[in-house]
């Protein structure tokens, strides 16, 4: 009440003095502006920006692997953990698009050990950190890459024409390229070994299943995932929402699209993988060729086909 009285007295004084030349109208206007914010703070709060976080969903998805029905099928020493700028437990490689489903990960050698005690933000892992830079892991892959360089084919033909037939040029080139591959792999040596991963920054997790157990694992996993409900197209969307997970889930999971999809999530590329289900904001994908499962944070997905 005292504040209200002060405002009334102030305004009365201003009205009384408005005919005098010394009246400070700007001061009065500034007072009114300040009055809105300081005396009525609840009416002029800045809108809160919703932050998209996959931590809870990724934790719930990983917790499924603790169940007795799923744990025996999982190789906990063949994991990869993908964030925006680094990968633990794998390198990036090229994809053979002729034989989907495929991914752009090498063999997995990271370890998922356990959930950190008394900490909801971290999981205990073991593995090496690498930059998400594709490396050729086969001689054929490197040869194909070098063969696309202009002038290389002509140079090889010229060398082949001048060397004696007793010299096996192919064997020499293979040895040179093999040495180059070894150098590239050595250059991609991990930056460091790590023991913990932040669930707040994980974009995707990949892990291997024993090939003979893949179908059994898929069947058991489906029991624990969210039930699928088809939805009709609804054009009344909340386009102001800064999170995209709802629209992506509607497209990947809630619609009658083909179950085989291609997904790009940061540095992870998956072609022709199967949509197995979801756990809240984590989409679960399967790769039957490599007996590999992917937990992908929906908000990290950039492109879909």
From Swiss-Prot:
Organism: Clostridioides difficile (strain 630) (Peptoclostridium difficile)
Function: Contributes to maintain proper thickness of the spore coat. May contribute to the formation of polar appendages. May play an important role in assembly of the outer layers of the spore coat.
Residues forming coiled coils: none
Residues annotated as signal peptide: none
Entry protein name: Spore coat protein CotA
Gene: cotA
GO process annotations (BP): sporulation resulting in formation of a cellular spore
Keywords assigned by UniProt, alphabetized: Sporulation
Domain of life, source organism: Bacteria
Cell membrane listed as a keyword: no
Inactivation phenotype: Inactivation of the gene produces changes in the ultrastructure of the spore. In thick-exosporium spores, the absence of the gene leads to thickening of the coat. Inactivation of the gene leads to a significant decrease of the spores with a polar appendage. According to Permpoonpattana et al., disruption mutant exhibits a major structural defect in spore assembly, with a clear misassembly of the outermost layers of the spore coat. However, Pizarro-Guajardo et al. demonstrated that mutant forms spores with a similar overall ultrastructure to the parental wild-type strain.
Cellular localisation: Spore coat; Spore, Perispore
Entry keyword Hydrolase: no
